Amino acid sequence: MSFTLYTNKNTRLQRSELAVPGSNYKMFEKALNSEADYIFLDLEDAVSPNDKSVARENIIKGLKEYDWKGHGKTMSVRINGLDTHYMYKDVIDLVTYSGKYIDTILIPKVGVRDDVYMVDCLLSQLEDEFNLEKKIGIECLIETALGMVNVDKIAQSSQRLEALHFGVADYAASLRARTVVIGGLNPDYPGDQWHHGLSKMVATCRAYGIRAIDGPYGDFNDPDGYINAAKRAAAIGYEGKWAIHPSQIK
């Protein structure tokens, strides 16, 4: 029997996580006044290529101008993928101009542990340059077949790593799985088609002391579907779930 136990690296309340497009500044105030525990301002999927620079500027401005902490929010930013030319500027500009307001960086489409190492190194250099007292945490989206196969190694990749998120939409695409609604169940499959991925990821998170967060449910006009998806995730140990619309926060 092994007596090795990994304690939780960083405890944060993350029951509900509201996704907010960085390109839509007027939504920032709505997020501020929402009931979400966690806010992630998005530079990736929710932002078109032509709006990447504007979204980055909006996020820097919004992090500094709004009293997120006073409203009890934990603040995260989803950067663009490491396979894009936007990523390095995302990290450098965010930390340079608003680093002290950021709690975590969310990395999309993490496939191998070296993806995390790259962002970790950038953060360390920037924190040292600007004498930031608080270290910025890292969260990873597991949303590809490669990421799921390597989830155990990814979970051990950095002392900054606080949470893994199950990115069901891109994960489904990576598997070529047939879906009806993002995060929903396909009636052609006799059971929960996401059970294996969800179970594997939450077990990994619990083993290494990091949080397990379920991703989006795509139809915000289907509250019952969202509630059922949230209950399924909670039943197997997930601590929280994304909301893509304030109406999904309970």
What are these regions (language model features)?
Residues 1-250:
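Expand to "…catalyze enediolate/carbanion chemistry for C-C bond making/breaking, isomerization
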